[in-house]
């Protein structure tokens, strides 16, 4: 592996929040080696020779992680190999071990033939131009060559003990835990049991084939098994983790899905009860009901761009104690480290639930609600998605409304809102609508339809 083979490094795998590709097509053992070399050089340039490395349960993990570590060591880094862990445990390692850099080898919720790299350098989760800078290092051969070393480090036990020491339940709860055969299975069911819950496990054996359902709790069809098991067992709540455990999906005791922006309402209320005036960050896809709720409980609401690395950067800038996005990433800085952690978020949810006499269904039903659409995706090209958004920001006529253009165009009316933004990970436009009545929802959709077709008449719109 002395010579760099550019064919093993397609530009397409260097994405907005991570590096991700299809194993055997755009991602090979050699790719992992050179990515390790680039990350190592960048970490050293930022004064951080120590790098933690973890992997999820994908079948390609052992092969790729071996080469990733070899690349880091050849760059001159000292690697702490934390083994098969969920992503939050790797983020935890990059907070509590000597070094503040880390690489998680994970395909997250993508199909089983994908894998990828989530990267933290000197405490900062890489995004956008920082990820492109790694590709530039490789193309210009701006690399280091030295001999580092690798040691195996047990992090899960420490992660487990710290959460069990922090989160205290007031009563025993019956909880169904669906790990979707992802990496959360190595710690989540055991942890929730250690908190004092009765755990009914579903698909908690790590299996990179994902034989039961896709490990993406953001899609309702992947929660069907969980909902059925919650109803069948009379559980207090159901929890589902994505493939690498940095997101959590929630269903109530009656089987209703709790969408992440409503979960954030509960966390906001809880955190603000102890930290009046705290800032809470949420992404542009979240309900309009969140801002008034945060303000009513004495907090400051800040809407920001979608993307876990972008939210973490904003939290650091502002000193925010809590953030969340519609995809299910929840970031808790109060009593924790501020990274997205589906497992710790689940523990904090159980703590809140254990202290109330209300059922999960009644607890969430008390929050204001609107009629909303699921996420609507429209296929376009990668270039087209940005030019359409530019044209909408520049030329569209939305009527009497409040516009937010930090990430696409969000148009807030008196009784509802609509959003169109370019996905950072796929060649699609992402839309979402919410309103207080079906008629208003339809009216807002019609406005968006008219404006979209004005700037791009060829678009195939499903609404």
Curated annotation (Swiss-Prot):
Cofactor note: Binds 1 Mg(2+) ion per subunit.
Residues that bind substrate: 325, 327, 329
Requisite cofactors: Mg(2+)
Enzyme Commission (EC) number: 5.4.2.2, 5.4.2.8
MF GO annotations: magnesium ion binding; phosphoglucomutase activity; phosphomannomutase activity
PROSITE patterns linked: PGM_PMM
Residues the record lists as binding Mg(2+): 108, 242, 244, 246
Active site: 108 (phosphoserine intermediate)
Keyword Metal-binding among record annotations: yes
Homology family: Belongs to the phosphohexose mutase family.
Role noted for this protein: The phosphomannomutase activity produces a precursor for alginate polymerization. The alginate layer causes a mucoid phenotype and provides a protective barrier against host immune defenses and antibiotics. Also involved in core-LPS biosynthesis due to its phosphoglucomutase activity. Essential for biofilm production.
Protein name per Swiss-Prot or TrEMBL: Phosphomannomutase/phosphoglucomutase
Source organism (scientific name): Pseudomonas putida (strain ATCC 47054 / DSM 6125 / CFBP 8728 / NCIMB 11950 / KT2440)
Gene name of the record: algC
